[in-house]
Amino acid sequence: MKDVLDDNLLEEPAAQYSLFEPESNPNLREKFTFIDLFAGIGGFRIAMQNLGGKCIFSSEWDEQAQKTYEANFGDLPYGDITLEETKAFIPEKFDILCAGFPCQAFSIAGKRGGFEDTRGTLFFDVAEIIRRHQPKAFFLENVKGLKNHDKGRTLKTILNVLREDLGYFVPEPAIVNAKNFGVPQNRERIYIVGFHKSTGVNSFSYPEPLDKIVTFADIREEKTVPTKYYLSTQYIDTLRKHKERHESKGNGFGYEIIPDDGIANAIVVGGMGRERNLVIDHRITDFTPTTNIKGEVNREGIRKMTPREWARLQGFPDSYVIPVSDASAYKQFGNSVAVPAIQATGKKILEKLGNLYD
């Protein structure tokens, strides 16, 4: 397995403009091992490698995400983690399990909400891997909506399994916002961490927000952006009419222009994710329509953010390779984790495990 710590990928900050750099202590490098489940394009991996970890297993079923992952880390993730043949490749021992698993309801039907009640969901596979391998710690990430999903029953079941069935110390989950950790994106996610009873850990504090606020101007493309990212006058007119219709009904849905000194909305897949993060950039010099622009290029400087800007919103370094189409890149970064927020929390986990690596 190629180790990214051996090349230049992570020799620069974890994000082009973030406050998170690889740990300077050379003795920390590869001081712990971790596995990367539902790996996507490797946001968790970058964060944990920045902290000195070595990834010894990864899984991701989406072929386009696998392509991006391999281009950046040199190894192809295993596929469907629900399959026993995939689980068989997981090394017996590793220190930390990382997973950004999807939110799914459980068919509890009045049961106690235990391990077997989660069968058939992707969380079941995460829990089963924890049960089999007994890592020292785990770090799970999910959408903020998990907190109230199914009237809170989903999260309650997850915590019950982790605490009661698996015997881990699991502090109350925290809602962590990426904007507080060096990236200009209002992205709230729920973090769940846990520690094996053998570690003796019985308390945990999530990281405090940083003082520094980063805005879109800090991550804007340095060079003139290609014309293809600019909207047509016709499409802008459609967006404005669409927004007016919704506002007349009392809805807040619609396109939004992020000012240079502003913070982006959470980047998401679908649901006008790109249109909710439009920007004004007057550096355009070529107003010749491209194949994906129907009609005239607008003269107001309104454009979509580029995939590289979305990468920066998530805290990916500029050396991170984007080998896929724009459409795939938007999807991949929209589904990814915010690297600096993951890294800040990962550092807190390692501080608790610190005595194990002295």
Curated annotation (Swiss-Prot):
A Pfam family matched in the record: DNA_methylase
Name of the protein this chain belongs to: Type II methyltransferase M.HpaII
InterPro entries xrefs: C5-MTase (IPR050750), C5_DNA_meth_AS (IPR018117), C5_MeTfrase (IPR001525), SAM-dependent_MTases_sf (IPR029063)
Binding partners and assembly: Monomer.
A single GO BP: DNA restriction-modification system
Catalytic activity as recorded in UniProt: a 2'-deoxycytidine in DNA + S-adenosyl-L-methionine = a 5-methyl-2'-deoxycytidine in DNA + S-adenosyl-L-homocysteine + H(+)
Effect of residue 55 to Y: Grows at 30 but not 42 degrees Celsius, has reduced methylase activity at 42 degrees Celsius
Domain of life from the UniProt record: Bacteria
Stretch forming the signal peptide: none
Active site positions, chain numbering: 103
